[in-house]
Amino acid sequence: MEILHSKIYGEDKSGTPLLVFHGLFGMLDNWGSFGKEMGEFFPVHLIDLRNHGKSFHSPEMSHDDLAHDILHYMEFHNLQKINLLGHSLGGKAVMQFAIKYPIKVEKLIVVDIAPKAYPPHHQGIIKALESVDFEKVTSRQEVEEILHQYIPEKSVIQFLAKNLYWTDDKKLNWRFNLKTLSEKYSQFVSNAIKFGVFSGETLFVSGAKSNYILPQDEFQIKQQFPNSSVVTIKNAGHWVQAENPTDFNEVVKDFLSEHRV
């Protein structure tokens, strides 16, 4: 059984551990500042999803696979009860886990994603990534120039370029498993979370400038997460924690520290 790669902050702190999962083409490093800050209060596990970062590669990538990975991670680290936070694809993973294993989850935070099916919307990015020939490129700059032919937003190119690394045979490559992410894309993006209910305290956080969570999604959210609320973070798009970290961190801290009766 392979265990997800992680970086742990605040390991010596008491309190329920918070497990944090990034989005598609991301990695745990995207959440480094958040982990450091929250690790002052309770243990925080920043985790690479399968086929991302330094976690194992696999041909399988369903929501159930992602949920099982979280279960195995908990067992390996001897965690009994956890708080979960997931952004985008990571949000789908934590929703699926909470519905399958509700007894293991104290509180759930879902960042800028709903439990619904989404139409495919990363084709341009996947095409850009597949257009890079690592037999030919010799620098990060060359890779970024190729990506720029397909992707106009500099911030997206920089986000993707964080995944570049030098292999043992002195070639650049992606840390994520592009083959599986491309082949299984519809499995994890176009599929809704399996129907089920998680009754624990749940917070959905959306970016004011993002369209991933729409007002009409709130009915389905309440069906599956009856004890949930939706908070919108101003001056933030889909990458909420990066675009307005001050407000985002405050909202998360408040939610996790509340003791409701």
Predicted regions and their residues:
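Active-site glycine-rich loops that stabilize anionic/oxyanionic intermediates
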Residues: 23-26, 88
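Alpha/beta-hydrolase fold catalytic core
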Residues: 1-19, 39-42, 79-80, 225-227, ...
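Active-site loop/oxyanion-hole signature of alpha/beta-hydrolase fold enzymes
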Residues: 7, 35-39, 45-85, 89, ...
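Serine-hydrolase catalytic-loop signature spanning alpha/beta hydrolases and amidase-signature enzymes
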Residues: 25-33
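Conserved serine/cysteine hydrolase catalytic core
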Residues: 169-224, 229-232
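Catalytic active-site module of serine/aspartate enzymes centered on a nucleophile-bearing elbow/loop
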Residues: 228-261
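Flexible "cap/lid" loop of the alpha/beta hydrolase fold
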Residues: 96-99, 106-138
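Conserved alpha/beta-hydrolase catalytic His-Asp/Glu region
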Residues: 135-189
